[in-house]
Amino acid sequence: MREHFNDGIEFARFLAHRFVTDKAPNSAAALTYTTLFAVVPMMTVMFSMLSLIPAFHGMGESIQTFIFRNFVPSAGEAVETYLKSFTTQARHLTWVGVVFLAVTAFTMLVTIEKAFNEIWRVRQPRRGVGRFLLYWAILSLGPLLLGAGFAVTTYITSLSLLHGPDALPGAETLLGLMPLAFSVAAFTLLYSAVPNARVPVRHALMGGMFTAVLFEAAKTLFGLYVSLFPGYQLIYGAFATVPIFLLWIYLSWMIVLFGAVLVCNLSSSRLWRRRSLPKPIVLLGVLRVFHQRQQLGQSMRLVHLHRAGWLLPEDEWEELLDFLEKEQFVCRVGGGEWVLCRDLGSYSLHRLLNRCPWPMPSRERMPAQLDEAWYPAFQQAMERLQAEQERLFGESLAHWLAEGNASAKVT
């Protein structure tokens, strides 16, 4: 039990490290800025899509009210009034204005995809028709799914009102769970569809459930803060709602992006437990696998490296690829696969270690054994090198900095 608890703590630390490394707070700030401009266009698109179906006619405002009541703290009531006014005015725009609103909505989706691809270490985002179809599906199917879910909620409510609480046992509990269910569905769809990478549905669902629960908890705590510490009203006065709403949007995106980090790393949850080897040693191991596959005329992906015994997490693999690609060792051949494109016979180990951005491993950090044919010779050479360094530089600083030794020769 204690071991599982310690593993959970270590995994949480790993996720926090990845959250910062992936620049998620910066992405959340960018998404907050984009959301300010895109929230009205997104609502306008939602109303337009719902108005195309007679059964959903007039349901847009009810959905908007439902969203603000269940997904925004109580401080958002004034913002809701303003947004309803802006959205009503936006419906009377000319076709030029409509195009501008559509572009703004697409810009928000581009920013979301960019943030997710940063977390999933995706080097090449979607392009062309594939990107357009994904965004159009989100903008069109999203409101329709919301409308369908809201219609089911309305039906359950009316059934209870007309035939009494016994008409549908558990209806009240079901209605109370509707906001959480909508959140889980929305986050699951977001995590599975937006990244330009393969995301297992099971992991997306787990991340959606985690994010939805965290979102509900944050909403409750944020509402308590607003009600118990109203000092911001003394500072901002009539404009107090604006900074509070901005802060809530930022916190919401932080939660969404942390959920994305969780989903991304669920597939590598076993790899973070391993004791990391010094990067130069890992680099040599990766080059050895690249060289072997080159001899067979085969390309390489991370899964091939795992099969060869090097269980690297994806972020470390991407970090090594960045260096190897910069030094023109490897080239991408499509489909996320890589090939060795340099003759290793013309490149010395000394040159590689000098170009390597990671420090040379100390004797204490060198693994005692490694299942690699090249490692014993490398280990022996490193021990001799460090012993020679200790012999040459073992004297005290006072000895080296003394004037009498300024012109002394090292022998």
UniProtKB/Swiss-Prot annotation:
Pfam families membership: Virul_fac_BrkB
Taxonomy, superkingdom: Bacteria
InterPro entries per the UniProt record, alphabetical: UPF0761_bac, Virul_fac_BrkB
One GO CC term on file: plasma membrane
Intracellular or extracellular location(s): Cell inner membrane
UniProt record similarity statement: Belongs to the UPF0761 family.
PANTHER family membership: INNER MEMBRANE PROTEIN YHJD, UPF0761 MEMBRANE PROTEIN YIHY
UniProt name for this protein: UPF0761 membrane protein PSPA7_4558
